[in-house]
Amino acid sequence: FIDIFNLSNNHIMDQGPDGLSRSIENIERLEKKYFGAGQSLAESRKPVIVDINGYKVALFSYCCYSSNSESYAKLSSPGPAPLVYEYIKQDVDEYRDSVDFIIVLPHWGIEHENQPTYDQVILARRLIDIGVDAIIGTHTHTIQSFESYKGKSIYYSIGNFLMNDFQLTASDRYYWSSLNKETMLLEMSIFDGDLKFNEIFLKFNKDMLPEVVSVDSLITNIKKINTTLIYKTANLKHENYEPNLDLSLKFNGKSMQVINNSQLVSSNLTARALSIKAKL
């Protein structure tokens, strides 16, 4: 059923380096492929290259720094690949001429929201500018808006699909909102050199299993959130802004938390300019 595993997420190191190693060992034992994490920074950034209708497609994944930010891959230590523009550009430049398509799958965004931040939009469009052919985001537990930029698809977050070993308690039923129970799959196809995606929408049923539904049956108003994204970013000069996410650390009384300082697209732009000259 699953041939390739994306390991780049903010929980892959919850059981430490041994947990990551065991995960990789089990994937390899099943003769499957993985990407997005590894025993070093270089290994975590290696793509999986798949063949689709005779076209070579490179899959890269990177994870935004979050509450467990010390667990990310470093030069010689294991973890998921960190979501850093300079790393992604280096990787795209290395593989651009040897594959037909490059897809980046970032694990990012503010949880339980239907819009990305301005920083995410800037980073996504900068990645398309340097040769990425599609972006498919995860992490927020919700469906977020999506767009086509320069004819390339950008899905900021596709929501939840399966929650392994989910304990369906009364509190779970209460706290897991209707928006968290909606998701979508992307069916990818390549014909005549064109990379296309077909959205398949799903909802979790009472047993927390996904069922295919029509877009009109979703509580998430896809048309509205996509229209808001287009309207709010219509005049965004993304090339004038810093491409990396604006993050900071904050102690919440128990632990250090990573805060995304950029505003959601549904609010006003507060992205960081590259320089005064660029801003002008």
Predicted stretch roles:
Residues 10-12, 39-40, 63-65, 107-111, ...:
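Catalytic metal-binding/acid-base residues of hydrolase active sites
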Residues 8-30, 113-120, 146-150:
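Metal-dependent catalytic neighborhoods of phosphoester/phosphodiester hydrolases
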Residues 14, 64-86, 110-113, 162-178:
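Acidic/histidine-rich helix-loop elements
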Residues 8-10, 92-115:
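Short acidic, glycine-rich surface-loop motifs adjacent to enzyme active sites
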Residues 51-102, 122:
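Binuclear metal-dependent hydrolase catalytic cores centered on His/Asp/Glu-rich metal-binding motifs
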Residues 2-4, 118-184:
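Conserved beta-sheet core of the metallophosphoesterase superfamily
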Residues 3-8, 33-36, 57-61, 101-105, ...:
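Structural recognition of the beta-strand scaffold that forms the well-ordered cores
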Residues 172-280:
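A short C-terminal boundary segment appended to hydrolase-like catalytic domains
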